[in-house]
């Protein structure tokens, strides 16, 4: 009944930190059992630097149609929330497995390093194969340009994580990339080793100034 649900929520709200800790512990235990039962089909089966578990971080806008707690105007001129989510990538044959989500008001910044660090830590705590602070390259964190901050990348480096992070190009960077010699470019390949049509990669270490 509604009164029962209301009383339960009130009870849980009395000690939010303890309740969230218990819920996250239960979720991690359930995931460990599920991945163990999946055997070779588990996301962490045979995970190493060449075949890492990939965690995707991305924020999304959730609309609210009335005045709700933490609902605020968004950068897209909407009204609602801006949670930051973490999903384990199950590959082309599967879907994303949610492992962490940080609830945020609609006006939360897209590239807030502290939020990306918080969600990454919560996501790693949900993985059965991550113990200790230095996780290693068996886990790769993937984000769009919202994760392209020095503070967040320094955190990933300290934890020895692999990462693939987008970054917005400035006019100067675009010119420097355009001036690369043809032999600097090599074909890009997808996860199955198939060459991607029209896609090329180049090593930019020492080419771009990333100190800003």
How does the language model describe each region?
Residues 75-132:
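Electropositive, glycine- and tryptophan-enriched low-complexity nucleic-acid-binding patches
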Residues 34-44, 117-139:
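Short, basic/hydrophobic alpha-helical segments
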Residues 77-85, 158-173:
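Acidic, His- and aromatic-enriched active-site or binding-groove loops in soluble protein domains
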Residues 65-70, 97-103, 112-114, 150-156, ...:
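Short acidic, glycine/serine/threonine-rich loops at helix termini
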Residues 164-212:
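An anionic, glycine-rich sequence signature occurring as long contiguous blocks
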Residues 1-5, 51-61, 96, 139-148, ...:
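Short, conserved catalytic/metal-binding motifs centered on acidic residues
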Residues 133, 153-162:
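Short, surface-exposed basic-aromatic patches at helix termini and helix-loop junctions that form
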Residues 2-89:
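Active-site-proximal, Lys/Arg-enriched surface segment
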């Amino acid at each position: 009944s509604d009164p029962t649900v209301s009383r339960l929520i009130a009870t849980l709200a009395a000690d939010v930190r303890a309740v969230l800790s218990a819920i996250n512990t239960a979720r991690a235990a359930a995931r460990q059992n599920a991945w163990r039962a999946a055997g070779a089909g588990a996301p962490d089966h045979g995970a190493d630097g060449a075949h890492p578990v990939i965690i995707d971080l991305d924020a999304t806008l959730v609309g609210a149609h009335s005045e709700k707690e933490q609902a605020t105007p968004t950068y897209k001129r909407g009204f609602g929330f801006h949670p930051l989510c973490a999903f384990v990538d199950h590959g082309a044959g599967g879907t994303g497995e949610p492992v962490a989500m940080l609830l945020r008001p609609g006006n939360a910044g897209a590239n807030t390093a502290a939020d990306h660090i918080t969600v990454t830590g919560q996501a790693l705590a949900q993985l059965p194969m991550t113990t200790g602070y230095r996780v290693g390259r068996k886990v790769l964190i993937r984000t769009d340009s919202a994760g392209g901050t020095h503070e967040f990348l320094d955190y990933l480096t300290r934890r020895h994580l692999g990462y693939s992070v987008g970054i917005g190009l400035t006019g100067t960077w675009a010119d420097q990339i355009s001036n690369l010699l043809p032999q600097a470019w090599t074909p890009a390949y997808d996860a199955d080793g198939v060459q991607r049509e029209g896609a090329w990669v180049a090593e930019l270490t020492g080419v771009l100034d990333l100190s800003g």
